[in-house]
Each structure stands twice: as structure tokens, then as C-alpha cells.
């Protein structure tokens, strides 16, 4: 009987160590701050950020990521353009490599916009710190925008982000539990 109890205690201890390692080195929690991703992610909601998997699988357009905006702040935004993409917005319409792209995650904000446009018109070369002679996103850089474009501070304000600024990809929202969601890619976004 004592041996069985000891085995249970060891099993539970090992499970806690594994959970700690997974929590510390593979997935980390993040609390949404602000309204820049509303209604996809709202202020105060909690998400799990995969800090390893995106490095092996790569980032794709439409992924939602957390990144270091500066020494003190992390932001959460959607990847709009990846290295090698030619990105352009014309009157709220996204074109990547010359092809019009759907952005279903903007439906709510387009219906409730305050002005004429929520994204406007710009090209990669118009962004801060960009090469004024090229509309192509360079290697190691990403264009990120918030889903709530009218209030979001994103690549339009600070330019392309470096790959090494990225903390990880949002895997799922776990709080509030009633709003649990595990995939934020465009084809799975309805609002």
C-alpha cells in the first residue's frame, strides 16, 4: 500500500514538473490589453501563446501574434504580410502580390466605422522606417495590423516588425471560458 501511494506521489510530482516546463518554455499565458484586436480579442481576455511551434512551422498571413513593441510593452496583432510579399491597401481593400484578399475578421469594424475608411490606403514603402523604393516586405520582417484598425497602433505607426521581436503565435483564448476559441485564422473568423 505504501509503495502504491509513493508511486502516486511521484507521478503527480512528475506531472507538475512537466506542466511547469510546458508552461514556461512552450506555451505562455498573455492578457489582452486594449481594444486594438476588438472584437476578435477583447481587453482583459486571456490567451495561450505558443512560443516554440511558430518557429518550426513558420508564420502565415492571418496568424495572430504577440511581439515586443518596445522594452516595456508587448502587443498582439494579426500578420498581414510576410517576407517576400508585396502588400498594398487601396481604400480598405488588401492586395497581396497583386491579388485582392478577403479579411472577414474586419466585418464588424467595417459595419461600425467612424470615418470613411478603417485601414485607408498605403503601401509597404509608405510605412515608417521602410525602404521608400520597395513595396516588398524584406526577409526577417512582418507587417502586422490590429483588427480594430481605427484605434490600433500597428505597422502603420511603427513600421514592419523584426522576426526576433515576435514572442509567439496565439494558440487559443482560454478566458473567459465561455469564449474559448482555438483558431484565429481568417477562414475561421466570423464577426
From Swiss-Prot:
Subcellular location: Cell membrane
GO cellular component, as recorded: plasma membrane
Membrane topology category: Single-pass type II membrane protein
Catalytic residues, chain numbering: 36, 77
Keywords: Cell membrane, Hydrolase, Membrane, Protease, Transmembrane, Transmembrane helix
SUPFAM superfamilies: LexA/Signal peptidase
Extracellular topological domain residue ranges: 29-191
Pfam families per record: Peptidase_S26
Cytoplasmic membrane side: 1-7
Catalytic activity: Cleavage of hydrophobic, N-terminal signal or leader sequences from secreted and periplasmic proteins
Known EC number: 3.4.21.89
UniProt keyword annotation of Isomerase present: no
GO terms classed as biological process: signal peptide processing
Superkingdom of source: Bacteria
Primary localization: membrane
Keyword Ion transport: no
Transmembrane segments: 8-28
Class of this enzyme: hydrolase
Functional note: Essential for cell viability.
Name the record gives this protein: Signal peptidase IB
Organism of provenance: Staphylococcus aureus (strain COL)
Gene giving rise to this polypeptide: spsB
Amino acid at each position: 500500500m505504501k509503495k502504491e501511494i509513493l508511486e502516486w506521489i511521484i507521478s503527480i510530482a512528475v506531472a507538475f514538473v512537466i506542466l511547469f516546463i510546458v508552461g514556461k518554455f512552450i506555451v505562455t499565458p498573455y492578457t489582452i490589453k486594449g481594444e486594438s484586436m476588438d472584437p476578435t480579442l477583447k481587453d482583459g481576455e486571456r490567451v495561450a501563446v505558443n512560443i516554440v511551434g511558430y518557429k518550426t512551422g513558420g508564420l502565415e498571413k492571418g496568424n495572430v501574434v504577440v511581439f515586443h513593441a518596445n522594452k516595456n510593452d508587448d502587443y498582439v496583432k494579426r500578420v498581414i504580410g510576410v517576407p517576400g510579399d508585396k502588400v498594398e491597401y487601396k481604400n480598405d481593400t488588401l492586395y497581396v502580390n497583386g491579388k485582392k484578399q478577403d479579411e472577414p475578421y474586419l466585418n464588424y469594424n467595417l459595419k461600425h466605422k467612424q470615418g470613411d475608411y478603417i485601414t485607408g490606403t498605403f503601401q509597404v514603402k509608405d510605412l515608417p522606417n521602410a525602404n521608400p523604393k520597395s513595396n516588398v516586405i524584406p526577409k526577417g520582417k512582418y507587417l502586422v495590423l490590429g483588427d480594430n484598425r481605427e484605434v490600433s497602433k500597428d505597422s502603420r505607426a511603427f513600421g514592419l516588425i523584426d522576426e526576433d521581436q515576435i514572442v509567439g503565435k496565439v494558440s487559443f483564448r482560454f478566458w473567459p471560458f465561455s469564449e474559448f476559441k482555438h483558431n484565429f485564422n481568417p477562414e475561421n473568423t466570423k464577426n
